[in-house]
């Protein structure tokens, strides 16, 4: 984003009940089931959801205790937790078809460590990390507030309150912010479309949604009343997988930085941490966030690249966007590689990724989340190397 002048920037989010997010949730549910049984299981699970039908497909390598029957039960529990018990999509009677097979031996031989050969990357690719000072979470403000609006609406829906009972699981948000010299100063428009029951009126929904927006946005940031769009097309009763088919991995911009930073193209959900699409994107965020937390720069974009079967990154690139505080970017790249082993194994061990921690990542963004110390999740959001970075640059 530009550092000078005035401009508008927009990001969107979708709720856990959006069809694509239902698919992401189920794929990560399968992943967590395998990692719970075997921390070194291999999983690449894709999910399709549509009217009363769920299809799982992909490749796995793990213990026989993870049976199709177990995965079907976990799939139904995930759908129930999201809140779907509707005629067109219900946890009780949706058809669940499971088509998972063994991981390709050709892929496994490139990834597995043998003898003196360290574990290789599960595929080639480029991954990006980003951090900035726009929010306390060091995330871009438009995506941060888009997520928060939907998270609050979901909390309300699941609260059992009178207002919450009017809401159904499928929802989307979109926040447009005005920037002055690279800093957000207020919202110019907010769009929220939320699925609802037949009994809900548009006036009631508007009151509920506007109240949540007011709770989420900073003081003085509310857009004009006429620029708050709630269910702009009117009725939104039929939603979720009954309204639109959903697929794993179709919300990669929602999952990351809302378009404020580049994206390498790889999705996250359903992939075990040997897949650098996921693990390297996590460590890239971790490194970028620690640079900003160390006050070495106000905005950081970081790129890492890998080749399948190769244990070290082919490149590490850091861009401080002119916001560095007397920091040499080449030295910073070298320092980051010294502080964190960026091999696939090194990333997994540093961030403790071989655990069943992925279901919570499947909605409301993989980044900008608050780590739960009891669960030891979202470890890539910790800023535990910021002090070492400051020391390396004599701060």
UniProtKB/Swiss-Prot annotation:
Positions bound to K(+): 46
Cofactor(s) in the UniProt record: Mg(2+); K(+)
Cofactor, free-text remark: Binds 2 divalent ions per subunit.
InterPro entries, per database record: ADOMET_SYNTHASE_CS, S-AdoMet_synt_C, S-AdoMet_synt_central, S-AdoMet_synt_N, S-AdoMet_synthetase, S-AdoMet_synthetase_sfam
Region (Flexible loop): 103-113
One GO cellular component, as annotated: cytoplasm
Compartmental location: Cytoplasm
Broad class of the protein's primary localization: cytoplasm
Top EC class, one word: transferase
E.C. number: 2.5.1.6
GO terms of molecular function: ATP binding; magnesium ion binding; methionine adenosyltransferase activity
Highest taxon in the source lineage: Bacteria
Pathway: Amino-acid biosynthesis; S-adenosyl-L-methionine biosynthesis; S-adenosyl-L-methionine from L-methionine: step 1/1
Disulfide-bond pairs as recorded: none
Residues binding Mg(2+), per UniProt: 20
GO terms classed as biological process: one-carbon metabolic process; S-adenosylmethionine biosynthetic process
Keywords attached to this entry: ATP-binding, Cytoplasm, Magnesium, Metal-binding, Nucleotide-binding, One-carbon metabolism, Potassium, Transferase
Binding positions (ATP): 18, 170-172, 235-236, 244, 250-251, 267, 271
Sites where the protein binds L-methionine: 59, 103, 244, 275
Family: Belongs to the AdoMet synthase family.
NCBIfam families to which the protein is assigned, alphabetical: metK (TIGR01034)
Assembly, per entry: Homotetramer; dimer of dimers.
Name of this protein: S-adenosylmethionine synthase
Organism: Granulibacter bethesdensis (strain ATCC BAA-1260 / CGDNIH1)
Species lineage: Bacteria, Pseudomonadati, Pseudomonadota, Alphaproteobacteria, Acetobacterales
Gene: metK
């Amino acid at each position: 984003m530009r550092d000078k002048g005035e401009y508008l920037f927009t990001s969107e989010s979708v709720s856990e009940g959006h069809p694509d997010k239902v698919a992401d949730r189920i794929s990560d549910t399968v992943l967590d089931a395998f990692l719970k049984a075997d921390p070194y299981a291999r999983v690449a699970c894709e999910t399709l959801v549509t009217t009363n039908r769920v299809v799982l497909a992909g490749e796995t390598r793990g213990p026989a205790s993870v049976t199709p029957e177990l995965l079907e039960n976990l799939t139904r529990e995930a759908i129930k937790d999201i809140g779907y018990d509707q005629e067109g999509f219900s946890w009780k009677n949706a058809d669940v078809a499971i088509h998972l097979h063994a991981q390709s031996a050709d892929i496994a031989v490139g990834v597995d460590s043998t003898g003196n050969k360290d574990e290789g990357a599960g595929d080639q690719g480029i991954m990006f990390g980003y951090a900035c000072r726009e929010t306390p979470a060091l995330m871009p403000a438009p995506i941060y507030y888009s997520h928060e609006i939907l998270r609050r609406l979901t909390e309300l829906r699941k609260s059992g309150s009178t207002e919450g009972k009017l809401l159904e699981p499928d929802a989307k948000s979109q926040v447009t912010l005005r920037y002055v010299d690279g800093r957000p100063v207020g919202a110019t428009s907010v769009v929220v479309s939320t699925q609802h029951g037949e009994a809900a009126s548009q006036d009631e929904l508007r009151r509920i949604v506007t109240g949540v927006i007011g709770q989420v946005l900073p003081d003085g940031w509310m857009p004009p009343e006429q620029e708050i769009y709630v269910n702009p097309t009117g009725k939104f009763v039929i939603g979720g997988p009954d309204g639109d088919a959903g697929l794993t991995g179709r919300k990669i911009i929602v999952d990351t930085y809302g378009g404020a930073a580049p994206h390498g193209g790889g999705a996250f959900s359903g992939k075990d941490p040997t897949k650098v699409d996921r693990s390297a994107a996590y460590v890239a965020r971790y490194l970028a966030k620690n640079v900003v937390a160390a006050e070495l720069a106000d905005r950081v974009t970081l790129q890492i690249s890998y080749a399948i079967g190769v244990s070290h990154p082919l490149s590490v690139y850091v861009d401080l966007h002119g916001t560095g505080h007397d920091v040499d970017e080449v030295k910073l790249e070298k320092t980051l590689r010294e502080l964190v082993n960026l091999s696939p194994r090194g990333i997994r061990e540093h961030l403790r990724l071989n655990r069943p921690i992925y279901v919570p990542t499947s909605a409301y963004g993989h980044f900008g989340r608050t780590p739960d110390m009891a669960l030891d999740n979202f470890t890539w959001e910790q800023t535990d190397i910021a002090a070492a970075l400051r020391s390396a640059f004599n701060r």
